[in-house]
């Protein structure tokens, strides 16, 4: 039985998982073949020397299951959401196999575990996760400290090249900008800093992209030297630190990942669709084989490795 069939045959309504996980998986099932193709493309970019793999921000864990199915020796699943980790464990019982290690946490958790277990992963793969990570600088720093020659592959729909995708994502980001701005305003107002309305407004603007914990650590306005300048800087959830979507230029990823090398690969459309959408997807996928068609790609894949 192939992996897609094993995943589809599970009775998710009777499975002991969170309602959020259940809804997320059930929404993904209609495009499961397409999603697994994306995971396969990411894994195909890894060299044969990779044996220990990290599925970072693994969510439902489908990448982990696929990696084990493909023969990776040790798959380490990492997600900060305990409900996601519990879901992967429950799915593994149903499918009959799963990741060898399940960690609940972030890159700090992964680094600590690797140090304690004396395990050095060969690669990290993340599907639709890099655009949500709170602080990319320490993220890449921790991965490099675990293994200076770490292979990394990240797919992201937050492509800066496709104007249609950017427009759609900006609409989503604008919706959350206002919500997160009000959340920061209300939180800062509770800190008893005796701020004037203008000072409070400055704080709200200057703390864009920060969590409540980081905001609370600032004890005076002088600590904020400049207002952040990303095009849409309010889309960081101040409670969780997760960004709604973050569209970064490729040069930013290259700067953050240095001295590692960043390669850019084009994504592809869902050719499993029927009718006109399926025909259009197959035509676009054909065009994506041609040079200079990056603005057509619905997502991008970043391959990061040592020079």
Describe the function of each predicted region.
Residues 304-306:
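Active-site beta-strand termini and strand-to-loop segments that position acidic
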Residues 134-301:
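S-adenosyl-L-methionine-dependent methyltransferase catalytic module, highlighting the catalytic core
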Residues 1-119, 272-281, 296-300:
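Conserved N-terminal segment of class I S-adenosyl-L-methionine
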Residues 84, 132-135:
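Short phosphate-engaging motifs
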Residues 51, 122, 150:
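Conserved acidic residues
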Residues 125:
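A conserved beta-strand element that flanks and buttresses the S-adenosyl-L-methionine
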Residues 129:
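Hydrophobic adenine-recognition pocket in adenosine-nucleotide-binding enzymes
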């Amino acid at each position: 039985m192939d992996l897609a069939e094993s995943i589809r045959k599970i009775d998710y309504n009777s499975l002991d998982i969170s309602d959020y996980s259940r809804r997320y998986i059930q929404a993904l099932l209609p495009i499961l073949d397409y999603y697994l193709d994306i995971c396969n493309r990411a894994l195909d970019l890894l060299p044969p020397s990779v044996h220990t793999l990290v599925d970072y921000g693994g969510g439902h864990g489908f990448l982990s299951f696929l990696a084990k199915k493909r023969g990776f020796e040790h798959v380490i699943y990492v997600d900060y959401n305990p409900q996601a980790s519990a879901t992967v464990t429950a799915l593994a019982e149903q499918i009959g196999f799963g990741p060898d290690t399940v960690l609940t946490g972030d890159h700090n958790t992964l680094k600590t575990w690797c140090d304690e277990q004396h395990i050095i992963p060969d690669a990290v793969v993340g599907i639709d996760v890099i655009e949500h990570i709170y602080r990319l600088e320490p993220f890449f720093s921790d991965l490099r400290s675990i293994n200076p020659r770490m292979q990394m592959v990240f797919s992201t729909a937050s492509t800066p090249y496709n104007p249609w995708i950017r427009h759609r994502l900006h609409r989503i980001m604008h919706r959350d900008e206002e919500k997160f701005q009000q959340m920061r305003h209300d939180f800062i107002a509770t800190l008893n800093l005796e701020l004037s309305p203008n000072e409070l407004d400055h704080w709200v603007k200057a703390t864009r992209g920060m969590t409540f914990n980081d905001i609370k650590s600032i004890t005076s306005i002088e600590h904020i030297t400049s207002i952040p300048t990303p095009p849409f800087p309010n889309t960081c959830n101040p409670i969780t630190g997760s960004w709604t979507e973050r569209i970064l230029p490729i040069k930013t990823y290259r700067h953050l990942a240095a001295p590692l090398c960043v390669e850019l690969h084009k994504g592809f459309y869902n050719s499993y669709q029927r009718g006109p959408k399926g025909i259009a997807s197959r035509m676009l996928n054909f065009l994506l084989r041609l040079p200079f068609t990056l603005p057509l790609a619905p997502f991008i894949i970043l391959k990061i490795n040592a020079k």
